[in-house]
Amino acid sequence: GEQKYLICNADEGDPGAFMNRSLIESDPHAVLEGMLIAGYAIGASKGIVYIRAEYPLAIDRLKRAIGQMREYGLLGKNILGSDFSFEIKIKEGAGAFVCGEETALIGSIEGKRGMPKSRPPFPAISGLFQSPTIINNVETLGTLPNILRNGPDWYTRFGKEGNRGTKTFSLVGKIRRPGLIEVQLGTTLREIIFDIGGGVQKNFKAIQTGGPSGGCLSEEFLDLTVDYESLASAGSIMGSGGLIVMDEDTCIVDLAKYFLDFTQKESCGKCVPCRVGTRHILEILERITNGEGQPDDLLALRTLGDTIKKGALCGLGQTAPNPVLTTLRYFRNEYLEHIKDHRCRATVCKPLIEYRVIKEKCTGCQSCVRVCPTGAITGPRSEPHNLDASKCIKCRSCYEVCRYEAIAGDAIVIRTAERQS
C-alpha cells in the first residue's frame, strides 16, 4: 500500500520549557509505545522522532529504548508474528524554533531549510516525501499506552467538558517551587501558582502562558481555568505548556521586548508580516525601554500586532505579537510610565534608572563595594559609601546584595533619571 509516516515532534524550543525532554529522559518507552500504537492505527510503517541535538541524554535513552524494543520483537518486520511492520528512527534537529511547526519540521527531515509552507495540502495528505504523514507531540503519544490500558472512560474522568485529560506544564520564574507539574485541564491559575507552586516571595504581577508567543496575564486572571478556550479568550495560548511567573521586579515592557527579540531572531524570514513586522515591533519596544518612546507608539504596536496575526504564514508569526498585545491590554499603564514619565517601576530598563546610596541607611558593610565591577562605589568600612554615577554601569549588583535594602526597603534605591531636554 501507500507509504505513510508517523512523526513524533520532540522539537521543544520554548525558553524555560522542558516537559518533552523530561518525559523522554525518564520514560522513553511510553513515547515509543505510543508511536507503535499510532503507527498501527493509521497504517504507517515508518516512524521518526524529531528531536533537537541539544538533548544528548534524551537522544541516548531513545536509542537504548529503541534497541530494547528490537530485542523484544516490538520493532521491525512482522511484529510479534503479525503482518504489521514498523521502524523508528531518530532525526536530530539543529535547534531552530520554527522547526516546531509541522511543515518546517518536515522540510528539515527532508534535508531542506526549515521553512513553513502554505496549506493545503496538509501533511495528512501530502507530507514527508509527499506521502501521508501524521505528526503528534511527545505528550500525546506518551499518553496513548495508558489510555488503551485503562480505557477512554478512565481518561475522560479528568479535565472539564470539552477539555478532557491532563496537561504537563513547566512552572518556572519567580515561583517558590518551580518544576514540572501535571494537572487536570480546567485547573485555575491560582491553584497552579499558589497551591502547587507555593506562591511568590514578593507581590505577584503576571504569568506568561504558552511560551515566547503566548500571552501575559495579570492578577485579574488568577481564577481563569487553564484550558484551550479560556486562554484563547484572554488573548493567550496553551502552547507547549510553559508557565512563567513574574513578580513586581519584572518590567512588563522589557519582558515583551525579550520575547519579541526571541521570535524575531527565530523567524525563518519567508513571509513579510513576520520578517518585517516583528522587526518593527522590536524597534519600537527598544525605543520605549531606552526612554525614547512616543505616545503614538502604542497605536503602532497594536496595529502592527494585529496585521502580523492576520497575515503571517505560520503559527510562529501568527502568535508572535501575543506578548505585546496582551501586555498592552492588561499593563498599559507601564507602557505609559515608560513613555510619558520616563520611569521603569521595576527598575530594569537601564536608561530610565539611576542608582544612589542613601547615607542614612548605609552601614558601610562594603558588600556593594566588593561586587561592583567598575569600582563605582567607594568608602571606608562602617561609614556611608559613595557612588560615582559616571562609573556606574547599572548592573544591579549593588542593589541585589545590599542586605539593608532587602530588609528595610531602601538602603540603595533607584530613582527615575532626569528627562533630557
Feature annotation, model-predicted:
Residues 46-66, 86-88, 200-233, 329, ...:
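Terminal amphipathic helices with adjacent charged low-complexity linkers/tails
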Residues 2, 10, 19-24, 46-47, ...:
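Ferredoxin-type iron-sulfur electron-transfer modules in oxidoreductases and energy-metabolism complexes
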Residues 163-177, 183-185, 345-393, 397:
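C-terminal accessory/binding modules appended to enzymatic or scaffolding proteins
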Residues 267-270, 361, 391, 401:
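Short pre-active-site segment immediately N-terminal to redox-active cysteine/selenocysteine motifs
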Residues 1-113, 359, 390, 421:
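Iron-sulfur-cluster electron-transfer modules
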Residues 8-20, 123-128, 170-175, 379:
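Gly-rich Lys/Arg/Thr-decorated short loops/hinges at beta-loop-alpha junctions or inter-strand turns
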Residues 34-38, 185-201:
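Short amphipathic, charge-patterned alpha-helical segments
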Residues 2, 59-185, 197-199:
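Hydrophobic alpha-helical positions that pack around
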